[in-house]
């Protein structure tokens, strides 16, 4: 999918100050580039629900954080997401790894993929799917558009790893 070094460079150009995350097998490949960044602070969390509270505090303090988690963690973080996005109205941007988008392992369906888009829609969250054909500049445009409009949003990154 998106290369870690190129993604970190883009996030820096977009003015992202913090990446609050609990990585998965696909997005975790960005770790080396994120950890080496001199401008973006990487904040590792134990549970995905923590990521939203931390990102909210950073945002309220004037930072420009994003949350990076896998779809199964997105499910776990529902109440924190609801509070931050809908009750507080904060424009937190999320990158969500879409596990199972390209199928399961050895013919088994990964139900993690079954629920992501319906749940994102149920949360009334602006979102966009990024597949292996997508370009990094499309992610940049989506980020800029939603931040300029003051809306929380989720970039759903179709994972090619299982």
Language model region names:
Residues 1-162:
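Thiamine diphosphate
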């Amino acid at each position: 999918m998106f290369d870690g070094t190129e993604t970190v460079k883009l996030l820096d150009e977009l003015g992202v100050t913090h990446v609050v995350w609990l990585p998965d097998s696909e997005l975790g490949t960005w770790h080396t580039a994120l950890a080496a960044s001199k401008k973006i602070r990487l904040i590792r969390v134990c549970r995905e629900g923590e990521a939203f509270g931390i990102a909210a505090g950073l945002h309220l303090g004037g930072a420009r954080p994003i949350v990076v988690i896998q779809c199964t963690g997105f499910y776990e973080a529902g109440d924190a997401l609801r509070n931050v996005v809908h009750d507080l109205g904060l424009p937190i941007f999320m990158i969500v790894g879409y596990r199972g988008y390209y199928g399961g392992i050895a013919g088994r369906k990964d139900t993690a993929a079954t629920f992501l888009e319906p749940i994102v829609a149920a949360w009334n969250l602006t979102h966009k799917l990024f597949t292996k054909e997508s370009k990094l500049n499309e992610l940049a445009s989506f980020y800029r558009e939603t931040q300029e409009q003051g809306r929380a949003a989720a970039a759903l990154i179709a994972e090619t790893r299982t």
